[in-house]
Design a protein with these regions (language model features):
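N-terminal Rossmann-like dinucleotide-binding module
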Residues: 1-73
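Short acidic low-complexity segments
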Residues: 50-51, 79-83
């Protein structure tokens, strides 16, 4: 298993959400609350078999804002946050 850490966010850049949701799958309610409607709609239109990797997972997340970290964790099924 390849373990991936998602580190940081930047304004206007939803890649932490899109990459994490594609790798881990996503929680529909959590992703809907993330504020990234474009990403939410994109992954919802994909077949579930297009989302997730058997040999990789985003296991840890840290961002500059603890509330953002919690939103990303909830949206993308990331088990651990880093302070």
């Amino acid at each position: 298993m390849i373990k991936i850490g998602m580190v940081g966010v930047s304004p206007g850049n939803g890649h932490p959400y899109s990459f994490s949701s594609i790798i881990n799958g996503y929680d529909p309610d959590g992703l809907a609350r993330s504020g990234w409607d474009v990403i939410y709609n994109y992954v919802r239109e994909r077949d579930r078999s297009d989302v997730g990797f058997d040999d990789a997972a985003v296991t840890h997340v840290w961002t500059q804002d603890s509330d953002e970290t919690k939103r990303l964790q909830a949206a993308c099924k990331i088990p651990h946050t880093v302070d």
